[in-house]
Design a protein with these regions (language model features):
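Conserved acidic, metal-coordinating active-site core of Asp-based
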Residues: 111-228
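Active-site phosphate-binding/coordination module
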Residues: 21-131
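Short active-site oxyanion
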Residues: 37-43, 62, 162-163, 225-226, ...
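Mg2+-dependent phosphoryl-transfer enzymes with acidic/Ser/Thr/Gly-rich catalytic loops
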Residues: 2-8, 25, 199-282
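Short hydrophobic/aromatic-enriched beta-strand-loop microsegments
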Residues: 62-69, 187-189, 246-251, 264-266
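Short, structured coil segments at secondary-structure junctions
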Residues: 60-61, 69, 100, 181-184, ...
Length: 282
């Protein structure tokens, strides 16, 4: 049934199109191009800021982009929606994270501001006793980004910030962050592969990927039932829940799978490509 009407298809990047430590497979890039050539609309829906999209996607023609976990929406090359955190909330949150000795980053629309500890660990030469492979991956990622700036350069009347990313190194801090931050943010933790490193996101309660795909459907003049979403983590929850068909990767969060309409193969197995084939969209 999926090939009978024009669909709007939304793809998360990390863990969905892109495996940790790998580039985007050529088969995935080809599939995205085929979907669009068949008359469907394709969108990227990512937690990343728009300035941090992978180079491998730059030659794939998109109909739109949902960036910063729903806080930044682009449609046919035009920015149609942006919302950011209040400067007071940012300053208050930074103080709490600093007191917790966390690594944290202010993800602006055009620049990313990194805390003092992030500068030492992610951009410097400091090696922690618990420098696990996941942390090494973060280091490699951030050292490739030219738009990183010391947090001291951020000012309340300067760069707008829609999202804060953080990393913790003590398990007891995970629940503490949820307790303190949940009043003002969607608090998203990613599955912990190691017991000494947790990374997460603080996203405005006024934004999520689900609300963003609803806005995109309205711009396209299609019903939400004609949307399909692919994701793997809890910042995809609202998108998977709201889409006409929500597809979760086999490598995805176990709780997210409980609300999925479909579960496809893992990102390493080109699950997106296989599911698009089963849906007769390519």
């Amino acid at each position: 049934m999926y090939n009978k009407k024009r669909k709007a298809i939304f793809f998360d990047i990390d863990g969905t199109l892109l495996a940790s430590g790998e580039g985007i497979h050529e088969s995935v890039r080809d599939a995205l191009k085929k979907v669009r050539n068949h008359g469907h609309q394709i969108f990227i829906a990512t937690g990343r800021a728009w300035c941090c999209l992978p180079e491998e996607l730059q030659d794939v023609k998109l109909d739109g982009l949902i960036a910063s976990a729903g806080s930044d929406i682009w449609f046919h090359g035009q920015n149609v929606y942006r919302q950011s955190l209040s400067p007071d909330l940012i300053e208050h949150t930074c103080q709490i994270l600093k007191e917790m000795d966390a690594v944290y980053l202010l993800e602006g629309f055009d620049r990313i501001y990194v805390s003092e500890k992030a500068q030492r660990i992610l951009l410097g030469k400091e090696v922690l006793p618990n420098d696990n492979p996941e942390l090494v991956r973060w280091k490699k990622y951030f050292r490739q980004k030219p738009n990183l700036y010391p947090i001291e350069e951020w000012t309340p009347d300067g760069e707008k910030v829609p999202k804060i990313t953080f990393m913790l190194f003590q398990k007891e801090q995970v629940e503490k962050v949820k307790e303190i931050m949940s009043e003002h943010f969607h608090v998203v933790f990613f599955p912990a592969a190691y017991d000494d490193f947790w990374n997460g996101e603080l996203i405005s309660r006024r934004a999520d990927k689900g609300t963003a795909i609803q806005k995109a459907a309205e711009l396209l003049h299609i019903g939400i039932e004609d949307t399909i979403a692919f994701g793997d983590s809890m910042n995809d929850y609202e998108m998977i829940e709201k889409a006409g068909c929500g597809v979760v990767m086999a490598n995805g969060d176990e709780y997210l799978k409980t609300i999925a309409d479909r579960i496809c193969e893992s990102v390493q197995e080109d699950g997106v490509v296989r599911e698009l084939e089963r849906m007769h969209l390519i």
